[in-house]
Amino acid sequence: MAVIPWYANEKVRALDARLIESGVPGLELMERVGRGVVDFILKQPLARSALILAGAGNNGGDGFVIARLLMEGGWKVTVLLSHEAARSQGDAAVNLTKLGKMPVPVVESRTLDEAALTELLDSHDLVIDALLGTGAAGAPRGETARLIAAVNRHRFGRHVLAVDIPSGTEGGEGIEAQWTCTAGGRK
């Protein structure tokens, strides 16, 4: 059995920064993470329907790559943003723009009441948490907290996969994920 080390969020951020400084572009890192997550997903017995919860930062960017790759693979995909699309930052914004050229519904969560949010969750077999990554600190707030609570209330009968780290675990209010896909080591 292989031993997989656990890393604190600060160490993971430092490792990511070193990779980027060594010449690996952030967009390439997102692409690698997205492909790794999709490779894992495709090995699971799922109904080919995914709702991707995406934050404004790099974890959301990973989610946009995952959405694009699943859509290219014939999946029904919907992206639910925890923020206004214009607030996506850096490489995440680049990947959201790429995704915008595909027939993938992208919905801002603030536009949904509780009934519409529940209906959206219920219409997908897999929920992918790409809200907050290792850069998050403290308890989730606002729409992010609302989405985490909704997923935890309605997770029965569907699969929940977290990208990088379950969102909100730093603040003790995290997504209850069935699976967590990480790059580099356990966090």
Located regions from the model:
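Glycine-rich phosphate/dinucleotide-binding loop and adjoining beta-alpha-beta core of small-molecule
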Residues: 1-7, 46-53, 58-187
